[in-house]
Amino acid sequence: MSATAETLAISTETREFLSRTHKLFINGQWVDATSGETLGIIDPATEAQISEIQLASTDDVDKAVIAAQAAFKGEWSKINSHQRTKLMLKLADLIDENIQTLAELEVLDNGLPMMLAEYTISGYASDFIRYYAGWCTKIHGDTIPVSPAGVANGESLTYTRREPVGVVGAIIPWNAPIAMLALKLAPALATGCTMVIKPAEITPLTALKVMELVKEAGIPDGVVNLVPGYGEVAGAAISSHPDIKKVSFTGSTAVGQKIVEAALGNLKKVSLELGGKSPVVVFPDADIEAVTMGAIRAAFFLQGQNCMAGTRLFVHQDIFDQVIQNVAGVASQMKIGPGLDPSSQLGPLISADQRSRVMSYVQAGKDEGAELICGGNQLDRKGFFMEPTLFTHAHQDVKIAREEIFGPVLFAQPFGDSDLETIAAEANKSIYGLSGSVWTKDIAVGLKMASLIDSGQVSVNCHAAVDPAIPFGGNKMSGWGREFGQEGLEPYLKTKATTVLFSQPPF
């Protein structure tokens, strides 16, 4: 019998952290929410309440923005780029030093396996902060030669400066809390912006812990503020606030559209990383063992609660049966259990509502005639667990092939000896365009298919390659803009052009 989360050991520090009713972090202080509302935090592996948070109101968001504005115009503006680098590197080091507590908190309020929690902290959170720390000293403008017809026959100097936009808002999803926090925090700090952050109200624990580390790192008060709360309250207040100059959001397409509407009031910049329904295209010469494990990771990483998930598997007919047999064999043997159990490979879904939503798609797949190869059941035990699920043999118009499920459900279908444009057209039959992958030993085929797939990121012989330096974002209904890499700095910056006239023109 697998151990339960209640019986698995967690550190004394984690237990102490969980025992608190957590306040808001505004202007470097832990303050009570004006709403007086609290929310219990639930462990999705046990359905037990493990901690409690206070919920921010619109007034609390206002206070956070005021603090962020004051810091932006005050002490933070006086800290040079070299000093920002040192502060960010200190924060990254503190995250690594606190990896045990952070990983335990991430497992307990999100449900992912411990191995993945540790990886998202050391392989994503701290690394993203270090990467962008290196950019602090490399953000610069240009000098621009101007035409004689423009100003003073060349007797002038025109230059540009890249300046921080000001206070930025970040709305963090629940599926990868600390990684998403870091990838939004890092470019904001690197560019000299200040922040108001709303974590998902059901997974706020690692963000709350990171605020302690922000303070310990010496980042000035007011630079980073955290307002846990409901999306329709705190999230809406951030999106519409006239003094927030840019919002970064990761989440559903429907909520992203609402954020765009809310941002119209002051025409703030908006970056959106939204839904996905990514294709995985497998050609007959592909390494079948690599494809098998690649498809498993693509579909079931983070229990399928992953915007980049490769949930549409297209396999050439010559190897389709073998690939499906292999994938089903691995999926059906995956160990499902609480993330604190080191043997667990697949944790619970985030909530009862999310599991019900995913199970409704499983039923829709059956009703629309798709063949269920494996899985399709929720587990009869405490926790929001369900089996990894594989469907095949249905047309592309079924719901499970079209709509983002955000759970461990994979739909596979064969393709024949069509030209690459026809195969790509099938892969592109989606309102989304976030990620995708191509599996082949023929590099020419891989590169051609990568160019034809309409997604913001395509990988060849792997799926969803992620690195701080690789720009990431979606096409179509998968979002606006790019995060990561140099492009990830752009939304946090504005360009100011200045011209100095040395002499008056002779006319």
Predicted segment positions?
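Residue-level signal for inorganic ion chemistry
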Residues: E47, R84, E106, G192, ...
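Short, well-ordered beta-strand elements within core beta-sheets of diverse protein domains
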Residues: Q49-A56, K73-S77, G169-A170, V280-F283, ...
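Glycine-rich loop-to-alpha-helix module at the N-terminal edge of alpha/beta enzyme cores
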Residues: I50-H140
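Conserved C-terminal structural/oligomerization subdomain of aldehyde/semialdehyde dehydrogenase
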Residues: A48-S51, I244, V281, K335, ...
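ALDH superfamily catalytic-core signature
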Residues: A254-Q396, S418-E421, V460, P505-F507
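Terminal low-complexity tails and localization/encapsulation signals of metabolic enzymes
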Residues: M1-I53, K86, K90, K138-I171, ...
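Rossmann-like NAD(P) dinucleotide-binding subdomain of oxidoreductase/dehydrogenase enzymes
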Residues: H140-A290
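Structural signal for hydrophobic packing residues in well-ordered secondary-structure cores
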Residues: F72, W76, A92-I99, A103, ...
